[in-house]
Amino acid sequence: MRARLLIPILFSVFILSACGTLTGIPSHGGGKRFAVEQELVAASARAAVKDMDLQALHGRKVALYIATMGDQGSGSLTGGRYSIDALIRGEYINSPAVRTDYTYPRYETTAETTSGGLTGLTTSLSTLNAPALSRTQSDGSGSRSSLGLNIGGMGDYRNETLTTNPRDTAFLSHLVQTVFFLRGIDVVSPANADTDVFINIDVFGTIRNRTEMHLYNAETLKAQTKLEYFAVDRTNKKLLIKPKTNAFEAAYKENYALWMGPYKVSKGIKPTEGLMVDFSDIRPYGNHTGNSAPSVEADNSHEGYGYSDEAVRQHRQGQP
């Protein structure tokens, strides 16, 4: 009986226990960014930019339009994982047979009455409601066993409010210009360009995971960069490069056993899934694209976004 009860309880504990991964809200955190995060963010950005296919732009003078998704947010998670014994409880109680005997006192009452030469005799027997003697007997042995498991997990996970650092966007813009230069493609001001290149940075951030599986634990930090780009000939408004997507993920992982270690540390970078929605299937209603490009002033009103400072300066000098 006891074995049949404990076996499913133990099985349920291991199946339904807090073995999972908690993903925190992506954040650079407060204060100075630590070196590992710098390395991952830079690696994912470099890989995404380096993988751009720019063969169609060879020998052309291009103007770059770079837009980066802003990321603002904050989050706080307090308390650990759920308690296992709040969901699964096993208890076995074996109680002995108990018998109690009570002895109640009895008394006899006799009454005699005489009336008109007649005599009556009445006898009654009564029992008191309070026992004079109580005897309790127990047969067999008693036992009690219980099973419970409490896993607190990780608690008090906090994230600081974050805002996209303009230097991050400027760094990404400089990486793009560096790759164009190394590919032999001239990046010039919009006034001197014959080609417009549009680069939209949809994802440029970090993800932190913590995995707990009783014996095995892991900490993982990931950085992702996902972008979409296309190029348009200014003369005939035709697409030189149709919308393409690049997505790369750099990861740093520490493996633990019972949170002792880490016994293994690994780093790597790989292509990841693309954008949930891209523009590769969009076609112009006519034979060419629109006649106007985004305004330099409108798209680069914030320092560090879009063109490099030098490109904006050259554009302004060319248009007094």
Swiss-Prot record:
It comes from Neisseria gonorrhoeae. Keywords: Cell adhesion, Cell outer membrane, Lipoprotein, Membrane, Palmitate, Signal, Virulence. A lipid is attached at residue 19 (N-palmitoyl cysteine). Belongs to the MafA family. The keyword Lipoprotein applies. This is Adhesin MafA. GO terms for biological process: cell adhesion. It comes from the Bacteria. Residues 1-18 form the signal peptide.
